[in-house]
């Protein structure tokens, strides 16, 4: 195998490790809690069971979940597909070169 083909094969094998979910996961920005301007404090008249007023509190129960039909996609799907095509072309070229070399050797042996 040529160096290029070996490199492509190695990239194909190592590229399968990285997995990225299809849907982006929302990121939540937490504000510093030791700052008095950003930390809301409940009033004394509010009941302890009242919903918190923090901006991220309403979103905390909405954790991203995978649906049964969702699919995990490799982040390198397209490049890996291209590398597979290039690897097949390199193998075909190497086979043609080997066949040409064999034909030259057989032609020399036949003429001796």
Curated annotation (Swiss-Prot):
**UniProt signal peptide:** 1-22
Q: Which Pfam families match?
A: CRF (PF00473)
**Compartments where located:** Secreted
Q: Which regions are flagged for Low complexity bias? A: 38-58
Region (Disordered) residue ranges read: 27-66
- Gene Ontology cellular component terms for the protein in this record: extracellular region; extracellular space
The molecular function GO annotations come to: corticotropin-releasing hormone receptor 2 binding; corticotropin-releasing hormone receptor binding; hormone activity; hormone binding
Q: Write the record's keywords in alphabetical order, separated by commas.
A: Glycoprotein, Hormone, Secreted, Signal
Q: Which residues are part of the propeptide segment?
A: 23-70
* GO annotation, biological process: adenylate cyclase-activating G protein-coupled receptor signaling pathway; cellular response to nutrient levels; digestion; hormone-mediated signaling pathway
Please verify whether the record's keywords include Nucleotide-binding.
no
**Keyword Phosphoprotein part of the UniProt annotation:** no
InterPro entries documented for this protein = CRF (IPR000187), Urocortin_II/III (IPR024270)
- What does the UniProt record tell us about how this protein is modified after translation? Glycosylated.
Matching entries from PANTHER family are given as: UROCORTIN-2, UROCORTIN-2 AND 3
| Subunit structure, as described in the record | Binds with high affinity to CRF receptors 2-alpha and 2-beta.
What does the UniProt function comment say about this protein? Suppresses food intake, delays gastric emptying and decreases heat-induced edema. Might represent an endogenous ligand for maintaining homeostasis after stress.
Q: Which family does the similarity line name? A: Belongs to the sauvagine/corticotropin-releasing factor/urotensin I family.
Q: What is the name of the protein in this document?
A: Urocortin-2
- Give the encoding gene's name: UCN2
